[in-house]
């Protein structure tokens, strides 16, 4: 099962395998506090797409489309997440303040629709 959690929220045992899916390290968070098992930069949106989106909700629909297309080309990184999910929860950790418009949500939906 795939879950989402902000990096600023406390890790918990229910999180299972915790993966940071952002390209940039979150501000003000130590590696210890983040409690991550993996930082998977390769699954993050391209720098160009991230800059274009700029957390603008008006660009959300188009961002989802473009990012989903990018994820289809990142099979190696996506495979890591699929494999981890076979043995328990995988929590996709992200830094964005907007919980409804962020890259981790796109990754989660992609994994749920493209994992058997």
Question: What spans do the regions from the language model cover?
Answer:
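Residues lining hydrophobic/aromatic ligand-binding pockets adjacent to catalytic sites
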Residues: 1-116
